[in-house]
Design a protein with these regions (language model features):
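Right-hand nucleic-acid polymerase module
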Residues: 1-164, 174-318
């Protein structure tokens, strides 16, 4: 269903605006929210990253004054230019970037420093230069073997207050053997190199671990990636069919039922996306305008042959 011509909506941080969970809320409280809200248009955002599929349902506004105060900042989906992982949207972008470009055929490394090679306290530039030299060594070894340059995402971490030493998390494609990958790091011999392991959330667990660590130097460049990685795919719609072959209905017409009966969300989503398996969903609200934000996660259904191949694999951990 097309939007009316001239109808422009403002970008705002709906996750910050709607941050109160609906879990265990009494029915009378939910009904009270329905009675005090205004009419609004809801959008549905589909984010595809690898085999992970996220759904975000949120109200849209034409004026920032209509948005809850907590969400009155401009929200950008593509935060590749934002290298500060203290920013929540940058962390989400890195998680999705990893899911889109890597799998259990690839490698996750944690590279550390011995005392002789430890960068000075707070000198993030020195630490980043070390990891950039490492990437150049990797690419030299790959070129010798007729391989293209590495695909990677790296995160640099450090916290002097918590006595956490400099270290780098690197997710890299698995074309080069793990022994060579580890030997190219010259700053320490005590490192971890392991094959990635996906689960129902893809690589989100690992990605969230490396970006959420509380060991960051504020306002410094924290992460980077190789050129040519695929961006997560994002699509925004304002209507869906209740089931295959049905008529399109506005997204807002589904919201009340999802909020009142949260157990209905999996069935609704399975009808919208029959090729996906449901993982989880959460409903949030804000009493500023008595409106809702729904976040759900699904994953592409694997063929039986893919499941057999996955369960037959072995993983090495060092």
């Amino acid at each position: 269903m097309a939007r009316k011509r001239g109808m422009q909506f403002i970008p705002y941080d709906y996750e910050a605006a709607y941050n109160k969970a609906m879990e265990d809320m009494h029915e009378w409280f939910i009904e009270n929210l329905f009675q005090h809200r205004k009419k609004v248009i809801y959008a549905l955002k589909e984010i595809t990253a690898g085999d992970q599929f996220e759904i975000e349902i949120y109200p849209q506004f034409r004026s920032m004054d209509e948005a809850p105060p907590d969400g009155r900042t401009i929200k950008k989906d593509n935060n590749k230019a934002q290298k500060n992982l203290n920013d929540k949207n940058a962390r989400k972008y890195v998680e999705r970037l990893i899911n889109e470009n890597f799998s259990d055929r690839d490698i996750w490394m944690t590279l550390t420093y011995d005392d002789a090679h430890l960068p000075p306290d707070g000198d993030v530039d020195a630490a980043i230069k070390n990891v950039q030299k490492y990437i150049r060594r990797i690419n030299y070894q790959r070129k010798k073997r007729g391989l293209p340059n590495a695909k990677y995402v790296y995160v640099t971490a450090y916290n002097p207050d918590a006595e956490i030493r400099w270290h780098h998390h690197i997710v890299m494609d698995g074309a080069l053997d793990m022994e060579t990958v580890e030997s190219c790091w010259k700053q320490s011999s005590r490192n971890e190199v392991r094959r990635l392991q996906t689960d129902e959330n893809g690589l989100s667990g690992m990605a969230n671990y490396i970006v959420e660590e509380k060991n960051r130097v504020p306002s410094e460049k924290r992460w980077n990636s190789s050129q040519g990685l695929r961006d997560p795919r994002i699509k925004v719609v304002h209507s869906k069919r209740p089931a295959a072959g049905g008529s399109y209905k506005k997204i807002g017409s589904f919201v009340d039922g999802m909020v009142k009966d949260r157990d209905s969300i999996p069935e609704i989503l399975k009808k919208w996306y029959p090729d996906m398996d449901f993982t989880n969903a959460n409903v949030y609200y804000n009493d500023f305008n008595c409106m809702f934000y729904i976040h759900a996660r699904m994953r592409k259904r694997r063929l039986q042959s893919e499941k057999t191949e996955k369960t037959g694999k072995t993983c090495r951990t060092t």
